[in-house]
From Swiss-Prot:
It holds the Pfam family Trp_syntA. This is Tryptophan synthase alpha chain. Keywords: Amino-acid biosynthesis, Aromatic amino acid biosynthesis, Lyase, Tryptophan biosynthesis. The active site is at E49, E60. Pathway: Amino-acid biosynthesis; L-tryptophan biosynthesis; L-tryptophan from chorismate: step 5/5. Belongs to the TrpA family. The alpha subunit is responsible for the aldol cleavage of indoleglycerol phosphate to indole and glyceraldehyde 3-phosphate. It comes from Herminiimonas arsenicoxydans.
Length: 265
């Protein structure tokens, strides 16, 4: 059982919902990434999602695009991101870390080389936005063989065929993108999300995390009633943007603590 699977099993046993915060590695500065990761765990995160900076993040809204730009100004590479995970693992061997990004940096490193380096660093899973499940059977199998989970995105426009492919190739959890569009955009219709997740669960037996558009504790709580976990990214990055650097770590922990409290009420 992978660390992600164990985490969801433990949450289910306690009748709790998962909290999965997202930050972009290297933003607002590389030396803050590992302290931010620890602060998010201290604030109640169950799984961490670490964004790999990329110059053309097509699924991201302006907030995460700016985060990528800031990280790339520090020349943060995939190699550096794996270094952050290794550093984090020195003092936290239990919290799962999922890398989220795009195919290009992985292709440049080579899929097998990436999987081996990710395993050595202590990565638990990947979300590769532009790797559809039907095109990465081999990559998914290599990840699973190395105790990591290939996590795939589903959206309001996903066909039944795509949902079945995610059921076949995915593991760990499935990430339901609650809005058509980019991260950080409009408000969520929880009833619509509930109906879509019900349809997905007919095929996908994995836990389902919902992200895109979760802005505050109330939205997180509403979404958690129909899912197994909530993913929250743009709002955390906005907190970091609006906070002086010396208070960034504290601000992230305070924000995520508020979300955790709402989920547990």
């Amino acid at each position: 059982m992978s660390r992600i699977q164990s985490t969801f099993a433990a949450l289910a046993a306690k009748n709790k919902k998962g909290l999965i915060p997202f930050i972009t590695a290297g933003d607002p500065a590389p030396d803050l990434t590992v302290p931010l990761m620890h602060a998010l765990v201290a604030g109640g995160a169950d799984i961490l999602e670490l964004g790999v900076p990329f110059s053309d993040p097509m699924a991201e809204g302006p907030v995460i695009q700016r985060a990528c730009e800031r990280a790339l100004k520090f020349n943060v590479s995939l190699h550096d991101v794996l270094g952050f995970v290794s550093e984090f693992r020195k003092t936290d061997t239990t919290t799962p870390v999922v890398l989220m990004g795009y195919a290009n940096p992985i292709e440049r490193m080579g899929q097998t080389a990436f999987v081996l380096a990710a395993k050595a660093a202590g990565v638990d899973g990947t979300i590769v936005v532009d790797y559809p499940p039907e095109e990465c059977e081999e990559f998914a199998a290599t990840l699973k063989a190395n105790d990591m989970d290939p996590i795939f995105l589903l959206s309001p426009t996903s066909t039944e065929e795509r949902i079945q492919q995610v059921a076949k190739f995915g593991s760990g959890f499935s990430y339901y993108v609650s809005l058509k569009g980019v991260t950080g955009s409009a408000n969520i219709d929880t009833q619509d999300v509930a109906q879509r997740i019900e349809a997905i669960r007919k095929h996908v037996k994995l836990p389902i995390g919902v992200g895109f558009g979760i802005r505050d504790a109330a939205t997180a709580k509403a979404v958690a009633t129909v899912s197994d976990a909530v993913v929250i990214g743009s709002r955390i990055i906005q907190e970091l943007e609006n906070t002086p650097r010396e208070r960034a770590v504290e601000a992230a922990q305070t924000f995520i603590s508020g979300i955790r409290k709402a989920l547990d009420e």
